[in-house]
């Protein structure tokens, strides 16, 4: 057996998320089907760095798997890409030690979230951005995001569908910038781990701060109350991208 680490990008629009689900098109399912075809029927199980929901995209998802035989990394890259649909691209393949695990070896992740501005929804980017038609003070958001940096209990920012009990996470970077060319604001979050829907809830809260509906330091209050109902909103899946996984 040879152990591989593979980095890939995908458009999440037409996937029911990353994880295999019965009778659903998923990223993991497509990958495992392709690898099983390469082995002429011997099943190959793929481990991902994390699960992305339906509609969420990836610029740098990482998977790991054992493969029967010893194919050079560059040949694995080419072989996998030859079997990929148009909405998945294999970016890099590496042969790694057997103890490497895409999820459990990860030290951190970076997510990007794109928000389209303007009153009307652009039909050409609606599947790849969130949309916020109301006024925004980006400087207020910049101030607010500084409160996220550090180690906090993110109970208020975890959707109920998650199964993880410990809600404490560390955020190393939380930034926002304006793109005048695309008329978007772009959030980036880098941390040691993220809870179910956490980034989308953080973005929704930050937008309300930028709009003046919340106090500029409301993140601090939400950390203290540990109540998901206090944060309320969740930004659409379409604007979220798993940008990079760190090991």
Curated annotation (Swiss-Prot):
<comment type="similarity">
    <text>Belongs to the tRNA pseudouridine synthase TruA family.</text>
</comment>
<dbReference type="InterPro" id="IPR020095">
    <property type="entry name" value="PsdUridine_synth_TruA_C"/>
</dbReference>
<dbReference type="InterPro" id="IPR020094">
    <property type="entry name" value="TruA/RsuA/RluB/E/F_N"/>
</dbReference>
<comment type="subunit">
    <text>Homodimer.</text>
</comment>
<dbReference type="Pfam" id="PF01416">
    <property type="entry name" value="PseudoU_synth_1"/>
</dbReference>
<keyword id="KW-0413">Isomerase</keyword>
<protein>
    <recommendedName>
        <fullName>tRNA pseudouridine synthase A</fullName>
        <ecNumber>5.4.99.12</ecNumber>
    </recommendedName>
</protein>
<dbReference type="InterPro" id="IPR001406">
    <property type="entry name" value="PsdUridine_synth_TruA"/>
</dbReference>
<dbReference type="GO" id="GO:0003723">
    <property type="term" value="F:RNA binding"/>
</dbReference>
<feature type="active site" description="Nucleophile">
    <location>
        <position position="53"/>
    </location>
</feature>
<comment type="function">
    <text>Formation of pseudouridine at positions 38, 39 and 40 in the anticodon stem and loop of transfer RNAs.</text>
</comment>
<feature type="binding site">
    <location>
        <position position="111"/>
    </location>
    <ligand>
        <name>substrate</name>
    </ligand>
</feature>
<keyword id="KW-0819">tRNA processing</keyword>
<dbReference type="InterPro" id="IPR020097">
    <property type="entry name" value="PsdUridine_synth_TruA_a/b_dom"/>
</dbReference>
<dbReference type="GO" id="GO:0031119">
    <property type="term" value="P:tRNA pseudouridine synthesis"/>
</dbReference>
<dbReference type="InterPro" id="IPR020103">
    <property type="entry name" value="PsdUridine_synth_cat_dom_sf"/>
</dbReference>
<dbReference type="GO" id="GO:0160147">
    <property type="term" value="F:tRNA pseudouridine(38-40) synthase activity"/>
</dbReference>
